[in-house]
Curated annotation (Swiss-Prot):
This is Protein PAT1 homolog 2. Residues 346-356 have a biased composition (Low complexity). Keywords: Cytoplasm, Nucleus, RNA-binding. Residues 49-59, 67-93 have a biased composition (Basic and acidic residues). The keyword Transmembrane does not apply. One of its GO terms (cellular component) is cytoplasm. Interacts with ribonucleoprotein complex components. Interacts with cpeb. GO terms for molecular function: RNA binding. The gene is patl2. It comes from the Eukaryota. PANTHER family: PROTEIN PAT1 HOMOLOG 2, TOPOISOMERASE II-ASSOCIATED PROTEIN PAT1. The lineage of its organism: Eukaryota, Metazoa, Chordata, Craniata, Vertebrata.
Length: 735
């Protein structure tokens, strides 16, 4: 792995976002790290004191107080002496042994220090050989210095450790192993097998915090030495120390305490010393930090010898506690964070990491379907469509919901359950109403009308509403329609109760029929009174409540379902009102064409009329319209409901005349009937066949009616227009 090459890693972006947070924690972490450096360094040195005392008696060379850094360009010759009794497998095992075993081996072997004479046996030690080969490679180090990648050079760290009197025997398999020793280790078959298959080990939970007395780390006499001022420029403060679990082997421990070097204002500067400063960005290895870690591939493990080298004998050392240590994981080319440092990072970065992780875990499948410009265009058009001049008409359900919500909040405020606050309301952009509206022009070659995104009235542009009337009339009509709809809903609730009583009457005993019938009649009478079917003139048709009810499709259905429950007199009044204002109803029904729902109930009412009542109803169609010379018959021939109602009236009259039942007519009824039949035949002969519509039902006795009063030529002409089915030969009745 070439550490000198510049690599752009994804962690650089996370570090740029977290730079401010790292700067704030710099001062706090420095004191913790320096104290941990002193504690761990003194602890390891205190274990090596007996070894160094024995070496002082055996070796005449003394340790200099201020050792200078040896220049890498002048290395001394190295003699590689291999001992036959020291197998490579044993070297790997020594790396993972515990602290006590390491100290015993150091005492038994006589120890190895930097101050001793370089004999053949000492040159075989990789820790001793490291002193002759200059600076180490960054991938061979496993410390917080490689982690952070920020700050000083390796020379500062070497100076601090040399002044503290740390000898090479203190750290067996130190990261300062030379590259020649690395080549020697590469010849080891056991290590090569580990490099080929790096075992996956779960992450280690290294949260061991405690006091020095609890962990057995006692301060040594070296605390009073003057060299302490060189190592720690800040005063001594009682802090928690970084402790390592006694179960963790030496190969998993950092070679020296967690000590990130001092850093300048910039996080990464190009002026750092090449070859001595890590080019790897800050990579925290804590599971609480949301920075992805790189897996330990065999290619990366190849450079990790020394304290971080994987040992094939890792499992035998920890087989008794397999379940508890399944969480351990050998770190990569960087070390674990300080426990207290990791806790601070996790506390400060938890909201940011959770929000980022929440968004990353739910990718938008439609993210790339529309560009940002297209999204803004759609949003703008939708917001324009929300602007309505008649909110109660165009957005009735939202307005009703908002009014209900306001009433609920008012009740809660009245009871003291909630503080007074404004409810959340849909905010729509304010659009100035245009003085004049121009219809969208149809462009040749386009489908339908042109879609104009800047149109102030989208509903008008697509002909969703009529814009022929003035705005004031549209506004008044909207509120009037809303009032009619509310009135219809109230009457419908009463009608549902009447229909429920009618269904129950078929399942109750006969002695209770009278009670239910009385109750039903009472409710029907109440509905009839609410409808307020008072006669009116043509000028007041738009103000009549009953006619307004018939202008709504739901109102027509209400009357059609109510007619069977009304009495004969009440139903006759409704029939008369419908026939009197038939032109008005036909004109307002051009959009919905829902008048046909009234044909069936009205037909049953017509079949129950007497001859005198029939003449009174049919004569309403022969009276001329106000301010016009046309008759209602002319409009009736052009409307399906009108022509069907006219044919039904004529058919019922012919049925009464041809029956044997006494009609008990009034004086002049026959003359009125004859005049009406002649007038209908005259208008029917003048109307073009193309303008006539097909009726809902064509009675079969209409030609028999006309044969009583018309000649043969006129009958054939009417037959062709009505397209009646063929009937047996008939005889014309002379007039």
């Amino acid at each position: 792995m070439d550490l000198g090459s510049d690599q752009l890693l994804p962690e650089d972006y996370f570090l740029a976002e977290e730079g401010a947070l790292l700067e704030e924690m710099a001062e706090e972490d420095e004191e913790i790290d320096l104290y941990n450096e002193v504690t761990f360094g003194l602890d390891q040195e205190s274990d090596e004191e007996p070894t160094k005392q024995e070496e002082d008696h055996k070796k005449p060379v003394q340790i200099p107080e201020a050792p200078k850094i040896e220049e890498p360009e002048k290395p001394q010759p190295i003699k590689e002496t291999k001992k036959p009794e020291k197998s490579p497998l044993r070297e790997v095992k020594i790396v993972v042994e515990s602290d006590e075993e390491h100290v015993d081996r150091s005492i038994d072997s006589g120890g190895h220090t930097m101050n001793s004479t370089m004999d053949d046996s000492e040159l075989g030690d990789p820790a001793v050989m490291r002193a002759f080969h200059g600076k180490p490679t960054l991938e061979s180090l496993d410390s917080a210095v490689v982690d952070s990648g920020i700050g000083s050079t390796w020379s500062e760290l070497d100076t601090d450790y040399d002044q503290s009197g740390m000898d090479s025997g203190l750290w067996e398999a130190s990261p300062k192993v030379s590259m020649s020793a690395t080549g020697q280790i590469l010849e080891d078959k056991a290590i090569l097998r580990v490099m080929e298959r790096a075992p996956y080990l779960p992450p280690a939970n290294l949260e061991f915090l405690g006091s020095p007395l609890q962990r057995g780390f006692m301060p040594s006499q070296r605390l009073q030495r003057p060299e302490m001022g060189v190592m720690s420029p800040k005063p001594y403060r009682p802090r928690f120390m970084r402790q390592q679990s006694p179960l963790v082997p030496r190969s998993m421990r950092p070679p020296f305490p967690f000590t990130p070097p001092r850093r300048g204002p910039p996080i990464f500067t190009p002026n750092q010393s090449p070859g001595f400063v890590s080019q790897t960005p800050f990579r925290p290895m804590s599971p609480n930090v949301s920075t992805p870690t790189r897996p330990m591939t065999p290619k990366m493990v190849r450079m990790h010898f020394g304290p971080m080298s994987p040992s094939p004998s890792f499992s035998p050392f920890f087989s008794p506690m397999g379940n508890a240590l399944q969480r351990f994981k050998v770190p990569g080319h960087v070390t674990q964070l300080h426990p207290q440092h990791r806790r601070i990072l996790s506390q400060r970065q938890r909201p940011q990491s959770s929000s980022r992780k929440q968004w990353e875990s739910r990718p938008d499948p439609y993210a790339s379907l529309m560009s940002q410009k297209e999204k803004e265009w759609v949003i703008k058009l939708q917001m324009i469509q929300l602007q309505s001049e008649n909110p109660h008409l165009d957005d009735y359900y939202y307005q009703a919901y908002y009014e209900k919500l306001e009433r609920k909040l008012a009740e809660e405020e009245l009871l003291g359950e909630r503080k007074k606050r404004e409810p959340t309301k849909l905010v729509t952009p304010y659009i100035q109403k245009a003085e004049m509206y121009e219809s969208v022009v149809h462009i040749e070659g386009s489908l339908g009308q042109v879609a104009v995104s800047t149109c102030y009235s989208p509903r008008r542009a697509i002909d969703a509403v009529s814009y022929a009337m003035p705005d004031e009339a549209i506004k008044a009509l909207g509120y009037q329609r809303l009032r009619v709809l509310k009135h219809t809903e109230k009457v419908f609730l009463l009608l549902l109760e009447v229909e429920e009583l009618a269904r129950k009457m078929s399942h109750i005993p006969e002695e209770e029929h009278a009670h239910f019938q009385h109750k039903q009649n009472y409710k029907v009478q109440r509905i009839y009174d609410i409808l307020n079917m008072a006669p009116c003139h043509s000028e007041d048709e738009s103000e009549n409540e009953f006619l307004q009810l018939l202008q709504v499709g739901k109102g027509k259905k209400l009357i059609a379902r109510l007619l069977p429950f009304l009495t004969r007199v009440q139903a006759g009044k409704i029939l008369l009102l419908v026939v009197q204002h038939l032109p008005f109803l036909i004109k307002n029904d051009s959009a919905e064409e829902s008048l046909s729902v009234l044909y069936g109930p009205l037909k049953n009412i017509i079949n129950g009329l007497s001859f005198t009542e029939l003449i009174g109803v049919i004569q309403e169609l022969t009276r001329p319209l106000p301010e016009s010379s046309d008759l209602p018959l002319t409009l009736a021939f052009q409307n399906q409901f009108g022509i069907s109602l006219l044919y039904c009236l004529l058919s019922h009259g012919e049925r009464l005349l041809s029956s044997d039942m006494p009609m008990e007519p009034c004086i002049g009824d026959f003359e009125k009937w004859t005049d009406t039949v002649f007038l209908v035949a005259k208008e029917l002969s003048h109307v073009s066949k193309s303008s006539m519509v097909e009726p809902l039902f064509l009675p079969s006795n209409l030609l028999s009616l006309f044969c009583r009063y018309l000649d043969k030529q006129t009958i054939h002409k009417l037959e062709d227009k009505m397209e009646c089915p063929a009937i047996p030969p008939y005889t014309a009745v002379p007039s």
